[in-house]
Amino acid sequence: MSASTTSLEEYQKTFLELGLECKALRFGSFKLNSGRQSPYFFNLSLFNSGKLLANLATAYATAIIQSELKFDVIFGPAYKGIPLAAIVCVKLAEIGGTKFQGIQYAFNRKKVKDHGEGGIIVGASLEDKRVLIIDDVMTAGTAINEAFEIISIAQGRVVGCIVALDRQEVIHESDPERTSATQSVSKRYNVPVLSIVSLTQVVQFMGNRLSPEQKSAIENYRKAYGI
């Protein structure tokens, strides 16, 4: 399940605090790929130092461990998912105990390689493996849908997905059921979609650090696009 409740654990607070420090999490006015004008922006690529990556890996790994999801391979869709799969695989082995020591990781090439080891999958074989997809955020679910297809062709079985932030917003504002990307993926493939934090938790964490104008902008955005 997604991190949709309002309670915050220490690893989530640390993740968000560091996100503010490195400006991965910002508030203002930002145009998204979807064309929406968002009052906040989340750019996980700004977790780009050793300290930040170590803490990011801890946040992902802790969320995974707490989910009790059983899997064999972490799959990172190219490109942003590649370093995430690697660092979280290491962190799981470090803090997760013996049952995570054998977890492997893999990722896809953007183009099929026709020489050397060939193929599109790099790293662990996905054949007959239970696969957890890892990515940064899920807005429309396009990258995740592509990952499902790649894994299926490689004869793996997706058992779940995890992202850093669940934006908790609809894919299409005209949708009468107000279905979010995470809900759509979960329903379509019958797998859990985990997250380190949800937008609800971000707002709770920020509290009075948000100005009245920022709070109002987020509230209006959620009325228009929230689930």
UniProtKB/Swiss-Prot annotation:
5-phospho-alpha-D-ribose 1-diphosphate binds at residues 79-80, 109-110, 113, 115, 135-143. PROSITE patterns: PUR_PYR_PR_TRANSFER. Orotate binds at F41, F42, T139, R167. Pathway: Pyrimidine metabolism; UMP biosynthesis via de novo pathway; UMP from orotate: step 1/2. GO terms for cellular component: cytoplasm. GO terms for molecular function: orotate phosphoribosyltransferase activity. It holds the Pfam family Pribosyltran. It catalyses: orotidine 5'-phosphate + diphosphate = orotate + 5-phospho-alpha-D-ribose 1-diphosphate. HAMAP family: PyrE. Homodimer. There are two genes coding for OPRT in yeast. Catalyzes the transfer of a ribosyl phosphate group from 5-phosphoribose 1-diphosphate to orotate, leading to the formation of orotidine monophosphate (OMP). This is Orotate phosphoribosyltransferase 2. The lineage of its organism: Eukaryota, Fungi, Dikarya, Ascomycota, Saccharomycotina. The gene is URA10.
